[in-house]
Amino acid sequence: MTTIAFLGLGNMGAPMSANLVGAGHVVRGFDPAPTAASGAAAHGVAVFRSAPEAVAEADVVITMLPTGEVVRRCYTDVLAAARPATLFIDSSTISVTDAREVHALAESHGMLQLDAPVSGGVKGAAAATLAFMVGGDESTLRRARPVLEPMAGKIIHCGAAGAGQAAKVCNNMVLAVQQIAIAEAFVLAEKLGLSAQSLFDVITGATGNCWAVHTNCPVPGPVPTSPANNDFKPGFSTALMNKDLGLAMDAVAATGATAPLGSHAADIYAKFAADHADLDFSAVIHTLRARADA
């Protein structure tokens, strides 16, 4: 049993912390939003009035926060309250630069630190099937595994500090391109008189198969649990995809890489997010269908 401080108890943090409680760990939580805090408390998290209070008696600190700036402020706020050699795990999605900065900040205070962003969305968090992409020392990851495993379907060591975030932005750029391509295919199928079920059966049994269709199918019917069957209530929102693509484009610019498809996907999602940020990112099919009907 480990005492864990979990900072950020929102859509992802709430089910993740609940799974840690279910695995027998003691979880001390903090979130500035009262509804998030009370929801976590209902699942066995001991909620504190401030982040430093939550961290004070913890062996491990997990952060799941919205931006790199928020993560930096959080670390600055809590590091002095942490016990020596506390393990910090940041599962937020932030830039590689920010990840390396908070890693250095934690190390300067005598702490261990990993960047460990996740893939799998709210469903994966609830089902404890998240993929953790981890950057940091292998020895530190060995210490972290018993804490990550109750939340994980897969844990992948990607390299040194920042490598987890590098893997996350690359993965989500691929995902965005795939989701748009799948949406384009279903819109074209409609125009050709091909049923959605027939196209789904072909793609999932052929070379076009990917998560964007077999799990996140953008049309109602073929996958009953996909957001398309629930008014596109987000498993992974357009706002978050737009944020992640922004991080990817920043990385492309900083490294001098080229990403023509990723750049086009970023442009499509930036425009779609202006009015539909709260929908699942598979709802991008709406804008593609509108273009086809124009």
UniProtKB/Swiss-Prot annotation:
- Output this protein's name: Probable 3-hydroxyisobutyrate dehydrogenase
**Do you know which PANTHER family this protein is assigned to?**
3-HYDROXYISOBUTYRATE DEHYDROGENASE, MITOCHONDRIAL, 3-HYDROXYISOBUTYRATE DEHYDROGENASE-RELATED
Organism's domain of life? Bacteria
Disulfide-bond pairs as recorded = none
Q: In which pathway is this protein known to take part?
A: Amino-acid degradation; L-valine degradation
The UniProt keywords, alphabetically, are: Branched-chain amino acid catabolism, NAD, Oxidoreductase
* Gene Ontology terms describing biological process: valine catabolic process
Belongs to which family?
Belongs to the HIBADH-related family.
Under which EC number(s) is this enzyme classified?
1.1.1.31
The organism is Mycobacterium tuberculosis (strain ATCC 25618 / H37Rv)
